[in-house]
Amino acid sequence: MKILVLHGPNLNRLGKREPAVYGSLTLEEINAQILNFTQERGIRVEFFQSNHEGDLVDQLQAAAESMDAVVFNPGAFTHYSIALRDAVASIDIPVIEVHLSNIHAREEFRHKSVIAPVAAGQISGFGSASYLLGIQAALSLAQSRRN
């Protein structure tokens, strides 16, 4: 099983950017948690982070050819990126949208996700555990598709 963990804009600033909202872990520390979790389960994982919408679209499209699922934190693109929405809708593998913070308990403009309607599901508000829960969901969906 191969999963792409895709990190969107500003996630490279984790640990420095608003730790009261996003926690004190860096992106590297979160990736290490994910790697430990996936290696224990025999899951291969690749990581990619970009602040650029087109790079994320490219990764989603490529994942359709080489991955079993995607765990995707689109960051602020969650709320308005039709390009990312269309990229998620265009691929035939499960995409789980994840967020460190609970986007539904934050500012009004963060409540709407344009990605969620085309994703397999959304996990929000569990800090770095959102990624681990997303991987579990992605794994379950990908395995059920194989059967």
Swiss-Prot record:
Its EC number is 4.2.1.10. The record marks 17 as: Transition state stabilizer. GO terms for molecular function: 3-dehydroquinate dehydratase activity. The keyword Nucleus does not apply. It catalyses: 3-dehydroquinate = 3-dehydroshikimate + H2O. The active site is at 22 (proton acceptor), 99 (proton donor). Keywords: Amino-acid biosynthesis, Aromatic amino acid biosynthesis, Lyase. Pathway: Metabolic intermediate biosynthesis; chorismate biosynthesis; chorismate from D-erythrose 4-phosphate and phosphoenolpyruvate: step 3/7. The keyword Lyase applies. One of its GO terms (biological process) is amino acid biosynthetic process. Transmembrane segments: none annotated. Substrate binds at residues 73, 79, 86, 100-101, 110. Pfam families: DHquinase_II (PF01220). Homododecamer. Catalyzes a trans-dehydration via an enolate intermediate. Belongs to the type-II 3-dehydroquinase family. This is 3-dehydroquinate dehydratase. It comes from Desulforamulus reducens (strain ATCC BAA-1160 / DSM 100696 / MI-1). The gene is aroQ.
